[in-house]
């Protein structure tokens, strides 16, 4: 089965073709990062317009790369949510229009299920069951995974997501958008002993997260230093180091608890923040101590992409899922509401 995947949930236009026999055979991505950088964040209307401009050329590109015609595909999978409603509509309407033209099914896919299963595209994918840490700009969740559509939410952020906290900390430190990679890069030069930031919600039982207080602590620290004069480059680096260590430590503590609570030995880490080198280093050490193993997507599949959508669509269709009767665009869509494929 050959499935075209379309991802347009936010600020990246991703298109890919996944073959259930050959694996990923074509993949293309257009990032809107430079366009949104001057505004310090994603502008929804601009995102939708850019998806409209870029989506069809990317579809043509992956078809050419795979040496296929549209009518040689077996299905189209598209991100139906969660995400920006206008951006979702671009992908959904394009998918349904092409599916009708090529007389093939179109299936809406949950964006976070795509991230959750992105490590399945790697050469050594994890077996079920596993614990998953989904950590991105919009989500921070721990999920117990027993199969496709068999998910149990263990914990989630009660306020800001980890990726959102990184972006806000970057603004406080006058770093460019998107903030996460810039904070991590700056943190490498920071003194780990100068500041110690709190590890929110780690002093009590449970698997929920909170990052808003950490954001406030970062702002307070920066303002205290500014009272004596402008922040130096070393001040910024030291704050970035303390912030990153606090976020990473919090995520590691909660993952450790989740593995202990479930008794599972496999940990999947996915979403944009999963690319953070310090987080991977700490989680690799933590899982090794427990005779467990951590799994990650390759770098380009940590962020939004069409490959993960094509993969999930293919798996659901193979398992008997039927195509959408109507176009779907669902800005808010809890992952825990998903169910196994039903024929």
Swiss-Prot record:
Binding note for cofactor: Binds 1 Fe(2+) ion per subunit.
Cofactor section: Fe(2+)
Keyword DNA damage: no
Main location: cytoplasm
Matching Pfam families: TsaD
Annotated binding of Fe cation, by residue: 111, 115, 304
Record's subcellular location: Cytoplasm
UniProt-annotated binding residues for substrate: 134-138, 167, 180, 276
Disulfide bond sites: none
EC number: 2.3.1.234
Catalytic activity entry: L-threonylcarbamoyladenylate + adenosine(37) in tRNA = N(6)-L-threonylcarbamoyladenosine(37) in tRNA + AMP + H(+)
Entry keyword set: Acyltransferase, Cytoplasm, Iron, Metal-binding, Transferase, tRNA processing
Superkingdom classification of source: Bacteria
Gene Ontology, cellular component aspect: cytoplasm
A single MF term (Gene Ontology): N(6)-L-threonylcarbamoyladenine synthase activity
One biological process term in Gene Ontology: tRNA threonylcarbamoyladenosine modification
Family: Belongs to the KAE1 / TsaD family.
Function: Required for the formation of a threonylcarbamoyl group on adenosine at position 37 (t(6)A37) in tRNAs that read codons beginning with adenine. Is involved in the transfer of the threonylcarbamoyl moiety of threonylcarbamoyl-AMP (TC-AMP) to the N6 group of A37, together with TsaE and TsaB. TsaD likely plays a direct catalytic role in this reaction.
Name assigned to this protein: tRNA N6-adenosine threonylcarbamoyltransferase
